[in-house]
Amino acid sequence: MKKYVSAIFTMAILSLALVSCEPSNKPTKDPVPEQLTTINDMYDSFKSCLSLNYAEGMTVTFKREDRSNEDFTVIESFSEYDSEEGESAGFSALLIESNNWEIDIELYAEGGYGETYEGAYISIVGTSSETAEYECEPLIIHSKDKIYLKDEATGQYICVLQKGVGIIYMEDNAGHTWNAL
C-alpha cells in the first residue's frame, strides 16, 4: 500500500512541475529556410509577420524570464510598398514602448533588374533604470510561417515573428528573453 501512495505522490509532484513550466518560443536550432525570390513575396511576408498584427495605441504583453509581465503600447506600426521603372521596395516597421523599454523593428526589401536585397534593423533599449541595450542589423531567415532575425556576429536569435501573430520571442544582448503572452 505504501508503494502505491508513494507512486501517486510522486506522480502528483511531477505533474505540478510540468504544469508550472512555461513554454518558451526561443529557437533551439536553425530553421529550414524558405526561398523568397521577389520583393513582393518578401514584403508580404514582412507585413503578415509584423505590422498587420498591431494597431497604433493597442497594448501587447510580454513575459521576461526574470520579471513579471510587461505591457507595451504600440507607438507606430506601418507598411509601405513602392514600385516604379523596374525597381521596387517594401518596408514594414513596428515601434513599441513600455515604462522600461523601447523596441524598434524594421524589415525592408528592395531591388530591380533581376536583383533583390532584404535587410532588418532591431533596437531593444532600456528607457529608465534598465541598462541593457541591443541594436544591430540582423540576418533574416524565412521559414514557412515565421521570420527569424539572427545576429550574424554572435549567432544568437534576437527576434522571432510569426505570420498572423507578430512577435513571439525577443532577446536582448544582456541575455534577457521575452515571450509573447
Where are these regions (language model features)?
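Conserved functional acidic sites
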Residues: 27-181
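C-terminal motif of bacterial Sec signal peptides marking the signal peptidase cleavage site
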Residues: 17-20
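Positively charged n-region of N-terminal signal peptides that target proteins for export
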Residues: 1-4
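Sec-dependent N-terminal signal peptides
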Residues: 6-12
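Bacterial signal peptide processing site
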Residues: 22-24
